Amino acid sequence: MKYIRTLSLLILSVLAGAVAPAVAADKETSRVLCLDGRDNNVRTGIGLMAAPWTLELWVQSDAARRGRREMLIAGGEYSSLSWVDNEALALVDGRLTATAARLTAPDTLDGAWHHVALVCDGRSVALHMDGRLLARRDTAYTILPGTIGVGEEDGTFTGSIDEVRIWTAAVSPRTLKRWAGRSLSPSHPDYAHLYAYYPLDDFDGETAVNWVGRGFRPFHLRNCRNKWRESAPLAYARPSDNARMRPYDDRQRLFNAVVQRSEWDCDRGSSDCQILKLRLAVQGSRRPMRLTGLTLSLDSTADLSDVAAVHVYATGQKALSGRRTPLFGGSHKPARRLQLATGGSDGLTLEPGINYVLVTFDIAPGATVGHRLWADVLSYELDGHTYRPEPPAATVAQEVTTRNALDGDYLKVLQWNIWHGGVHLADSGRHRVISLLREAKADVVLMQEAYGIQQMAARATGYRMKSKSDGDNLALFTSLPMEDSIPWREPFKSNPAIVTMRCGHRVVVNSLWLRYAYRPEYTCYYPEVGGNPARWVHEDSLLALPDIRNLIENDVEPYLRPGMSAVVGGDFNACSHLDWTARAARFHHGYGPVAFPASLYMQQAGYHDSFRTVHPDETLRPEGTWAVIYGQTPYGRIDFVHSKGALRPVQSKIIRMMPEIDAPWPGDHAATLSVFRVAEK
């Protein structure tokens, strides 16, 4: 039983489907992405891609309404790097253009559907349309395909897009032509190099799944606006009218099976903590397949007694469907190996598109804080035949964590910059933010860029709240008794209060925001070559450093009485010397060590960086907080939770995925969730 057997099944399915011509799918189920040229902002989040690569998609330009310069695949925000092409494929005056290669189609696009591709093999770049080579030039370069249909802030495409395929290989002209009008399958000769695949039939106004996406950054589409204060129409989907693209709708076949893990820790005594999802991507509706078995390994769970029960559910075709249908008989006693089968029942009938299967744990009330929780999908069965999923991406292990009502000497603190009030994910971003707050179950939430969500979040969670106004930058939420006797001096930068833990320990807490370096804005553009870290340090010494010194010396230290502790956290808009070391320079484009002054000040003032205290090796845990949604900057940690006094950090995690596995992230910053314990005297 090997992974290759899945591929064998799929190839046989393709051959079987070749006996009779495929019938075009119902146009109501085959959909395309529509952009209106105004303020659509559809992001993939994909980062830097060195040659070889291929960009491939179907386009239908609105010739009557299009602008002079429109992007098809580009970099999006913060993508302007001198050595990178962030406008890979565009329309300039209606003509297909690869700017960096100086390639332009001879004719303007009409209003018909066209298959277009840009291919770089490491030596040359070629522009193709409808199976014809339009132009070629001897050159090679790195691209940043972070958006579909929009540039850094403008250049929105006017028209429709379908079947976006991004490859880490140079797809041959023959293969491009042969597969242009066909749905992809694992029999494609470059299938192993498929980096992103958006059929777009599942686009729901908020997101569309990257069928090959894996890990904490699966590059699912995120639908939003650039002008966040405005309300221009979002990109949307409509039934396809592309007669040249014939989706597969014959005997059902499996495209792939991907395991997506959660990184969220599980509270002691909690039920149905999400551990993983098996994402089954299926094509075709004739003779649908059934999931009839699942084999799980719990070998990497530290102690099986921490797990009270294991559950498996079918959760529908959307990550956020809300559906949970028990599979394989409901609850199961944990074991190192769990072989689950339908036991004569029909099993889960798979639907065309994405199908999710969720594995959850009930955590024992007496589970040990810090113990590892883990499950592997060893195999799954379709109609009684056994296959293995694709190897999962590396993720941070889940652990048992505290439960507020049970552990009075623990303090759980969530810090998060939610990005402009949480409005950057379609029209549902604020609801996604609140769902994360509920799931985190933090005692204290230190929020930045709250901008209007304050009252909505307080009502939804039941938290006490302190904010200068409902439209202000900073907000502080807590489930604990709170004294707001500390006055505001600079409410845009500092929001202090005092909370009393369940054990009686009093803590000064502060949600803060510091000014950022902008000459240059190194936290966003550190992938640039030829950077000068001394200049970054100088800028921070003029902005972030005086801000943090002012806030600590005036809004925290004067209110620390004997026996009290302090927890301060927020968006420092500056990196840490603890991360940017010589050993970790490979994560930061060769830069390091860098003596960032704000983090050095906190260390010298006696404050402990909770994440780096718990994870002292910066090469083993290099995660960043800015930005989760931009693949070119994965290791910029600029958000921190620091402590001082009797509180000691015992757990800390960068939260970079939603509690609901495989759902889109609503912000740009990751969150930081740290657990502290009052030290014994």
PLM ranges: what are they?
Residues 26-37, 56-65, 82-141, 224-238:
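Extracellular glycan-interaction surfaces
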Residues 22-38, 177-240:
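Extracytoplasmic low-complexity segments
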Residues 34-53, 101-107, 152, 180-189:
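Short surface loop/edge beta-strand patches of beta-sandwich-type extracellular domains
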Residues 239-405:
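Exposed, polar/acidic Ser/Thr-rich sequence context and nearby capping/turn residues
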Residues 28, 134-160, 185-195:
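Flexible glycan-contacting loops in extracellular carbohydrate-active proteins
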Residues 54-63, 155-181, 196-204:
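Extracellular, beta-strand-rich glycan-interacting domains
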Residues 34, 55-56, 66-82, 177-183, ...:
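Aromatic-rich beta-strand patches that line glycan-recognition/binding surfaces
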Residues 401-435, 439, 476-681:
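Active-site regions of metal-assisted phosphoester/phosphodiester hydrolases
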